[in-house]
Amino acid sequence: MNYLDLILQQQQDKIAIITDDNQYTYGELAQKAKNIRQTIDLTAKRRPIFIHEDKIIDQLISFLAYSGTNHIPIIATDASKNQEFIIKDIPENACMGVMTSGSTGKSKLFWRNYNSWADFFPIQNKIFNINEDTVIFCQGSLAFTGNLNIYLGVFACGGTVIATEKFRPKNWLDLMTKYKVNTIYLIPTKLLLLPKFATLPNTQIKQIISGSQSMNKHDALKLKQIYPKTTITLYYGASELNYITYINDIDMTEDRTSVGKPFTDVKITIKNEEIFVNTPYHVEGISLPFSLKDKGYIDTNGSLHFLGRKDDICNINGLKISTSKIENALIKVFQTNELIVIPSHKNDSDTLKAFIAGEKQFTKQEILKSLKPYLTDFEMPKQFIYLKTLPKNESGKIDKLKLQSLM
């Protein structure tokens, strides 16, 4: 079984995907992939194929064309395009390569077998309320593993994807109305742009799926003002492990560290504040339980709390500081996820700089006063830098490397 076969199993005259330029039935999608497959040397030595297409539909068709052949498709991230990967052996069971987002400048490459995703589709689709009637809106490249996984999960049950490359929230709302979208998949920073542009509530949206960033009850209420009939599901996951935990809006509180309870078959343990995960749906070649080097704890209700990555701890003039803690405090002050804290070393001194999207709202003194209930003096950023927008990678995460080049 492979992903092209998965497409061929669906109702062939049903619309599979609508993009900025065109629409394709399942049959048309399969035929385009078959046309490319006819040009592939299926007798050649097994090797990885890095897909560098810019358009979502070209990424998808190329991926499907190579799926199930002796060539292993990898939809490449922008960060990886200048990287050299030394690939000695591809695991025998591997059907695809997946990459991490590369928010620090480099992407990591992992191998997946078909069942590590396909066997989980029924579980995730049940939690996300995805079925053959789903019409889901997604934005951005399939190099973001979250997008590719959601697409394939929707295709596995015969749903329809509405896809756009454009970063235009007003246009997103128009597309949702035009194509009668009932499900949205976007990361929180993109989701929370929608209330700024929506003029009327949309009762057609029944499900919102989000992840890769934090969200709390306050954020959920903003979204429910424009999508009153929706259920919001936030997940915690990783390229290496698939989905780990999830939480619905009804269970969210003001505590944005809570990421909910484990998916079926996923087990979590905590050792010295480090999160370890045991799951059958992991990439090839890792040992279990696996650590993402994330910090957290499990509360009395069995919910996991994500406290940031271990490498978010930086040394500022001899003191260990958590940039995640500072960012969460800044989110409370600025009421936006569009910010990041980065340590800087200059003139033999370490300082913290906060980058914030948008125009200056407060004086530095006002910000520091607002932060006092949450941070100690040595945790306070020394500089607040305002940019119209913060640079992002394919996953929608803030690109730290590009910001560091501005420092």
Question: Whereabouts are the PLM-identified features?
Answer:
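Conserved structural elements of the adenylate-forming
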Residues: 29-34, 109-131, 139
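AMP-binding/adenylate-forming catalytic domain of the ANL superfamily
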Residues: 375-397
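Conserved AMP-binding/adenylate-forming
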Residues: 221, 226-231, 240-303, 311-313
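Gly/Ser/Thr-rich phosphate-binding loop
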Residues: 183, 195-253
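Conserved AMP-binding A3 loop
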Residues: 73, 95-122
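Conserved AMP-binding/adenylate-forming core of the ANL superfamily
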Residues: 13-43, 81, 88, 112-115
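Conserved AMP-binding/adenylation subdomain of ANL enzymes
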Residues: 119-135, 143-183
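AMP-binding/adenylate-forming catalytic core of the ANL superfamily
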Residues: 51, 293-379
